Every structure is written in structure tokens, then in C-alpha cells.
Curated annotation (Swiss-Prot):
Gene Ontology CC: one annotated term: cytoplasm
Substrates-to-products reaction catalysed: A + NH4(+) + H2O = hydroxylamine + AH2 + H(+)
Protein name per Swiss-Prot or TrEMBL: Hydroxylamine reductase
Compartmental location: Cytoplasm
Organism encoding this protein: Thermotoga petrophila (strain ATCC BAA-488 / DSM 13995 / JCM 10881 / RKU-1)
């Protein structure tokens, strides 16, 4: 099947065009339109969360209108223009991430490094999953002074880095890892669960009656909370058995904001010039429950000790329990936050380039990314729009990429797919 399009009444056989569009749309144009729609979805997620906090950008809204309109039937048949739209989507996603970062910092303060407990505290519990810091804050306000303790899950882990959230004493730790462990995790712990955004799964019957959604998230058979009154969530938590006091087997470090890392720039420069840091790698992204994604942990474990790894998004959970140590006080594993905090990794790279007096593309920097869904598509186009090279992606290429699109991505943008950890390390470090 070369393409699939069934958005108009002319769809072949009444089911969909699979070889060529009845309208004249080529398979490559159809796939590039799909790519653009996916990127728009990713931008919309970040833009939505920024607007929840009262931050807006009409330029982003204008782009979303135009770009989505361009995919309507009989509007645009030009493949090159859709490549340009994709790059513009990358630039707009950059604006959206900048806007959301601004919203988060002005609302909750700039993150600072913190160690997060992975065990449980004696008392009642609520697990918060998703990405929505506003929902978490409102819940924390409402459980103050009670024995109902709040635990983050997956992409909510970076919340602990924000001073304005960390100040709440009922925010006590993080349970679980990436989004796909939730059915097992939520069954294991007798707690109330609040799903705040994407990355929620249809629940099993073992916990459906103690799960709630809020904001954009909704699940069949699960009570949805409109607004931010979480009384029902808290009462459900109170009705459940206490969690026992149980220390975690390790702690997780997060909260490395742009300012924190940039404050170390002179020391980093000194270590690079002394040959004690030889390469920086961004290893992270959206994780998936594939055996293939064991690659990322093995990759980091096999890196030489003269490397520094920046991680982000739920892909961090493949590696963030590893003790990589430090290089004269510079941590070898730096967690900069959620997937939208790709902007932090970008700003760090730009700051280091300025310190060394070079372009970002001249830094000893490689990106090794895992992708899962549409937000990752938007982020990839952001990186490509910035002209970044040395990007490895896995576990698989997006299904919308055909040979023509792959040629553009590899020839013009230098995109590569992951192979085997040792092979890729040798290629990256040229050893």
C-alpha cells in the first residue's frame, strides 16, 4: 500500500485511495500531509498546556489554521511545499515549547536539581500521571494538611524540580517508570489515580473505579473531573487502604534547568579543553514497550566515561536509575525534564556553542532519540528546522516515511536510524 486517504467522497471503492489519489494526490504528498497533521497535533499539545496557564501566541494559532487548511482536499498538491510546512511546523513547535517553558517558570519557578524518592510513605495515596503541572498544583493545594500523599508517574517526575510545586509537603515521590507500565503499577498500589493529559491507557477493571481524568484526558467508564475540584479523587484515596512505609531501592535526579547547566559552562569548557569531557549526547524521547528499546540503556552503559548524557521525556526511564557518576562535579547524567523541555536541551547546546565560539553543529554533540507519537514528530522537525545534524532515531522509522521522504531526511538532514549500541558508539565517537 503506497498511501491511505479516505477523507473525501471520491475515495477509491468507497474505502480509500491506496495507490494514488483519485484527486491526483501522489503517495508522497499524501504521506507528507499525514506528517504535517501529526506535527500539528504535537504542537497543539504544548500550546494547549501553555494556554491552560494563561499564555498565548497568535502566531502559533495562525500557523495551525493555515497548515491544517493546506491538507484539505484539492488545496495543495505540491510535495516541496509540504516539506517547507513541516520545517515551519518545527519552528512553531519551538515557539510553543518556549511559551510553555515561560509559563511553567513564571508560574512555578525555574527548576533546580533534586533527588526524588521512589518508595512509599505511610498513609493514603494518589498517583498523578500525564504532563499537566496545573492539575498537579491544584491537587496539592487540596491535600495540604492531610495524610493523603501525592506521587508522580512517568512524565510528571520533573514536577519535583519546580520550587513552586516542591514546596508542597504532600508531594513525596515518584512511582513507576514510563507510561506503558501503568496497568501493572496502578493495579499494584491501592491508591486513587488522576490522569491529566495524553499517555493514559484504558484501565483494567482492577483499578477503573479509582481512576479519574481531568483536563483533556478522558477514558471510558472513568469519572471525569471538569475544572480543578478534586474532592472526589481525595475522598476515594481516603477510602482505600494505607500504603506502607517502604523506601525505594534508588532515588531519581531531575530539575536541571537551562540556568543550572549554563552556570556550569566555564567548568564544562575547562573539562572539554582538558580532554576530560569528549562528547555530549542527548539520549531520550518518547519510550515504547519494545524489546528494541533496550538499545538505549545498553547504549548509555557502554559509553566511555568521558561522555555526558542529557536526557528528557519518558525515555529517561530507560537510563535514569543508572549511577554514571560525575566528571569533577559535572554529572554524567542530566535530566532536563518533560518532552516539551527539549527546549532546555536546545538552549543548553546553544549556550555551550557560544562558550566555545562555534556553531551548535560544530559541538561534540549527538542526539540519540526514541519516538512514540505525534509530539515526537513535531520535535524532530524542530531539530531539523534548527539545522541540527547527527540525529539517530529509533526504534523504527515513522510508518509515513516512504523511500522518497527517506531520501530527503537522510540526504538533506543527515537523519540516521539506530543500529547496534557498540556500532553506533564507534561511529559517533569515531573510535
Amino acid at each position: 500500500m503506497q498511501m491511505f486517504c479516505y477523507q473525501c467522497s471520491q475515495a477509491a471503492n468507497g474505502t480509500g485511495c491506496t495507490e494514488y489519489g483519485v484527486c491526483g494526490k501522489s503517495p508522497t504528498v499524501a504521506r507528507l500531509q499525514d506528517n504535517l497533521v501529526f506535527a500539528i497535533k504535537g504542537i497543539s499539545a504544548y500550546y494547549y498546556h501553555a494556554r491552560e496557564l494563561g499564555y498565548d501566541d497568535p502566531e502559533i494559532a495562525g500557523f495551525l489554521d493555515e497548515a491544517l487548511y493546506s491538507t484539505l482536499t484539492n488545496v495543495n498538491f505540491d510535495a516541496q511545499s509540504f516539506v517547507e510546512y513541516a520545517l515551519e511546523a518545527g519552528r512553531m513547535n519551538l515557539r510553543a515549547m518556549q511559551l510553555l517553558k515561560k509559563a511553567h517558570i513564571e508560574t512555578y519557578g525555574e527548576p533546580t536539581p533534586v533527588e526524588v524518592e521512589t518508595g512509599t510513605k505511610k498513609g493514603k495515596g494518589i498517583i498523578v500521571t500525564g504532563h499537566n503541572l496545573k492539575a498537579l498544583e491544584e491537587l496539592l493545594k487540596q491535600v495540604e494538611g492531610t495524610n493523603v500523599y501525592v506521587y508522580t508517574h512517568s512524565e510528571m517526575l520533573p514536577a519535583h524540580g519546580y520550587p513552586g510545586l516542591r514546596k508542597y509537603k504532600n508531594l513525596v515521590g515518584n512511582l513507576g517508570k514510563a507510561w506503558y507500565d501503568q496497568r501493572k503499577l496502578f493495579t499494584e498500589y491501592p491508591v486513587a489515580i488522576l490522569g491529566t493529559s495524553n499517555c493514559v491507557l484504558i484501565p483494567s477493571e482492577s483499578y477503573r473505579d479509582r481512576m479519574f481524568t481531568t483536563s483533556i484526558a478522558r477514558l471510558p467508564g472513568v469519572k471525569h473531573i471538569d475544572g480543578y475540584d478534586y474532592t472526589e479523587v481525595i475522598e476515594k484515596a481516603k477510602s482505600l487502604p494505607d500504603l506502607e512505609e517502604k523506601p525505594g531501592s534508588y532515588k531519581l535526579r531531575t530539575g536541571f534547568s537551562t540556568s543550572v547547566v549554563v552556570s556550569l559552562a566555564d567548568k564544562i569548557k575547562e573539562l572539554v579543553e582538558a580532554g576530560k569531557i569528549k562528547h555530549f549526547l542527548v539520549v531520550g524521547g518518547c519510550d515504547v514497550p519494545f524489546k528494541r528499546n533496550e538499545y538505549y540503556r545498553e547504549f548509555v552503559q557502554k559509553l566511555p566515561k568521558e561522555t555526558v548524557v542529557i536526557t528528557l521525556a519518558c525515555g529517561k526511564f530507560r537510563i535514569n536509575d543508572l549511577d554514571l557518576g560525575d566528571i569533577e562535579g559535572i554529572p554524567r547524567l542530566i535530566d532536563v525534564g518533560q518532552c516539551n523541555d527539549t527546549i532546555v536541551a536546545i538552549e543548553i547546546a546553544q549556550a555551550l556553542a557560544k562558550v566555545f565560539g562555534v556553531e551548535v553543529t560544530d559541538l561534540p554533540l549527538t542526539l540519540v532519540l526514541t519516538w512514540m507519537e505525534q509530539k515526537a514528530v513535531a520535535i524532530l522537525w524542530t531539530l531539523l528546522a534548527l539545522g541540527l545534524k547527527n540525529i539517530y532515531v529509533g526504534p523504527v522509522l515513522p510508518a509515513w516515511v516512504n523511500e522518497d521522504i527517506l531520501k530527503v531526511l537522510t540526504a538533506e538532514f543527515g537523519l540516521k536510524t539506530i543500529s547496534e549500541p557498540e556500532k553506533d558508539i564507534k561511529e559517533i565517537l569515531k573510535v
